[in-house]
Amino acid sequence: QGQGKYDLIFSNPPFYLDGLKSGNPSIDQAKHIRPEVFRRWMEKTHELLTENGLFYVIVPFANWDFLQQITCECQLHLMQQITIHATEEKLNSRIIAVFSKEKKDLLVSALTIREINGKYTKEYVALTAAFHHTDLSAKN
């Protein structure tokens, strides 16, 4: 039975590559991924994307170099990179990346979630306003 192709694939994969495991198989499966499984996942993503399809993924900054290497090997091209900073002092927490099969101009940006004093940044509040039942700016 043939598999369909997708215009958009979004993934929030297990975050830890060869990290310290908890000992709980369910938790470990949800949070950890072996490099060879990561590679197969990228190969399958390439197979399932349409020629103009987009692949969005969020990964910890610590896995960024590995992800770039694997996606390059799988002929997925980076077209957008958003670096997420937890605070103005805690830089490079996560990367949201967008890949495609076609080479395109790279867009690079950053988003800081909280200010040093713990308040949400105006940019974060504006970006996520539709997802909250309360006004985050009121909590600032």
Q: Which role does the model predict for each range below?
A:
Residues 18, 86, 113-115:
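Generic structural "secondary-structure junction" signal
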Residues 30-34, 88, 117:
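Alpha-helix initiation/capping motif
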Residues 12-15, 61, 103:
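Short, flexible active-site-adjacent loop segments at beta-strand->alpha-helix junctions, enriched
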Residues 1:
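Short loop/turn elements that flank and shape the SAM/SAH-binding pocket of Class I
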Residues 4-8, 13-40:
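Mobile active-site "lid"/loop adjacent to the S-adenosyl-L-methionine
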Residues 35-92, 96-97:
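Conserved Class I SAM-dependent methyltransferase catalytic core
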Residues 91-140:
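SAM/dcSAM-binding transferase cores
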